[in-house]
A protein has these predicted regions:
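Short glycine-/acidic-enriched loop or helix-start segments at secondary-structure transitions
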Residues: 11, 65-66, 147, 180-182
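Short loop/edge segments at beta-strand edges and connector loops
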Residues: 3, 83-84, 138-140
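Glycine-rich FAD pyrophosphate-binding loop
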Residues: 1-12
């Protein structure tokens, strides 16, 4: 694995740390259901706090949130969907007796999920990876790709430390992944 600076030095080290399965795209939801199970596998190492996740919404979001709930149910992801302003208020007052928000007409309560401390959890992933044979090279900047002579297949990664020959490349750069192919 190549790391431009250090583990958790970028967005993963400062992101909000929320672990949830509240996504509108079905494929993302299945991936996140698996991801939540990874967090649950070692909460101590990941500094993971399984407190659940609430999406509290006004009427304008009701239909979309209902769709998310149905898709969660279809993959066996435990959640509860509360509808109607009165029922939503009662549900929230059951958790927070001083609840006062108005205009809430739906609540999606994911029973799984929660939050983790960012850098600690990413460092735990680093430790688990290296203990399973992953080599992490830090301080390596990717400059481009070496391509096969008769194809566009990637045969190496060009870095500021030289070229690394390879058979496969996996880009794990989050929303910046597209930049590697441009």
């Amino acid at each position: 694995m190549l790391e431009k600076k250090d583990i958790a030095a970028g967005a993963s080290g400062i992101a909000c740390g929320v672990i949830r399965n509240n996504y509108f795209q079905p494929a993302m939801r299945e991936l996140m259901a698996h991801s939540v199970s990874v967090w649950e596998s070692d909460p101590k190492a990941f500094k993971y706090n399984a407190v659940g996740y609430l999406q509290i919404s006004p009427e304008v979001m009701h239909e979309d949130v209902a769709t998310i709930y149905e898709q969660q149910k279809a993959i066996g992801y435990e959640s509860e969907f509360i509808e109607g302003e009165k029922d939503c208020t009662n549900y929230m007052k059951g958790m927070f007796d001083d609840w006062q928000a108005q205009g809430i007409t739906s609540i999606l309560h994911e029973k799984k999920g929660g939050y983790a401390f960012n850098k600690d959890s990413i460092k735990a992933l680093e430790s688990k990876s290296t203990s399973n044979g992953v080599q992490i090279m830090k301080g390596v900047k990717v400059n481009g790709f070496k391509r096969g002579s008769n194809s566009k297949a990637v045969t190496g990664i060009e870095t500021d430390k030289g070229t690394i020959e390879c058979e496969q490349v996996i880009i794990g750069a989050g929303p910046w992944a597209r930049d590697f192919w441009n």
